[in-house]
């Protein structure tokens, strides 16, 4: 009887041992399967062509319902972050016109100004070949601790810096620490992270004498020195860890051109028939040649320099001073819209000069100079402009009032915020 009990006890122990070994083996193969499955995702690195490969790092915070903050550090896949489409998004912006009203220029605060439709806020940018994580303000601030940023250019650069400040203000309020006499150049500080963000006004990037009022009305042609860079920004470049530089639309203004301290021609200067008409494309090409050479020289900056392509406007039935309007309320597809000839000329010059500078001045990899080609991305958002709501509640007194339309700048919040999603991804994974 004792022998039988002993035998049963041994058999019971063997069964338990077999179950334990089986559980260990099942866990091991399940883990292997998980690892193999994970390898289907991919890492991302920046290239001078504007195309990127994606490595998604773990987010510092998770926004509710934010399916785009995905696990990262996985495998590499090539992805052009600038080629994609706008898709519906139920989440919307991370800030509002009220929460960031003090930082938004009044002309771009469309909702406060009375814009009645809000559907334009509920679209997000989706690259064709990969997922783009949403902008994570906490993560950005942590990455940029003790760093300095600069946005250099015209009023679109101001539009851009205000977008970034609003997104970051959801974590920490910036403190304005400097402005020039005309409030065109400003600097902010995030004291908890020791991050400095500057906006430097230099609409041509080269030296220019400008004669116009705050509404853009000129009293004389611009005097433009195509071969002299504006020291307002060049003198500060060594102090910036990151800079985003852009220009474009100001070159369409009437201007007198100078090179080597000599008058060489003009654009749209019919009142001076003795001066040769060279066209804005001549001036833009000559100016950007010098700008790109400066940016590509590593001795001129200590950090990463992004050149952002010019942004398209969406004026219809006229332009800024001739009654142009923009009444669209949703995005369009690439097939539904064509780039205007003038925008194509600007864009082609920008790309050509960028590639030339990379080819001639760097080791073919661009060095610290990178390209942000947002032209097509923004071309498909004709609904993102202030339009009639550039001024505060323009139709309160007269529903038929004639108002200045703004189809050049961008509503905040709005589609312009998604530029920051792309920029953060290129920085994190570049």
UniProtKB/Swiss-Prot annotation:
Record's function text: May act as a bridging protein that binds pectin and other cell wall polysaccharides. Probably involved in maintaining esterification of pectins. May be involved in the specific O-acetylation of cell wall polymers.
One of the record's GO molecular function terms: O-acetyltransferase activity
Regions crossing the membrane: 15-35
Annotated compartments: Membrane
Motif residue range(s): DCXHWCLPGXXDXWN motif: 406-420
Membrane topology annotation: Single-pass type II membrane protein
Protein name per Swiss-Prot or TrEMBL: Protein trichome birefringence-like 24
Major location category of this protein: membrane
Assigned protein family: Belongs to the PC-esterase family. TBL subfamily.
A GO term from the CC aspect: membrane
This protein's UniProt keywords: Membrane, Signal-anchor, Transmembrane, Transmembrane helix
